Amino acid sequence: MRFLAVGLLRSVCLMAVVALGASASVAPAAADMMALDGAWSGGGSVKFPSGAKEAARCRANFKKRGAESYQVSARCASASGKVEQSALLTYVGGNQFTGSFFNEEYKVDGTITVTVSGNAQSVSISTPAGSSATFKLTR
């Protein structure tokens, strides 16, 4: 059970980081002005399918992949352990990005949504197994 919880936590944490980083653009035309490239960090919480919650911290690196997309790699940690994940985010309008994430170690994937407000990002992550996470990242 703990092994599964750690895998889900890791996937959710990475997804949150990715989502937070992707939402920094307000519009494709403004992408250069609000570039997500570089390092972001912050914290939030992870909810497991069992209903248990844990605080978590994440560090994410964003690399522009196209006019409206970013590749993200993230490391997150909680009381359950540490995890590394990757994600691809696409601009969807306004100040939001959405995409998918994947944790290679635990073979966990899911969706991520990032909303940008100034120098902060709000990230929301979910997995088909019922895990979720929310994070706030800053530069």
Predicted regions and their residues:
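Polar low-complexity intrinsically disordered regions
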Residues: 1, 26-27, 62
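Bacterial N-terminal signal peptides that target proteins for export
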Residues: 1-15
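C-terminal segment of classical bacterial N-terminal signal peptides
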Residues: 15-28
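Central antiparallel beta-sheet cores of small beta-barrel/beta-sandwich binding domains
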Residues: 30-139
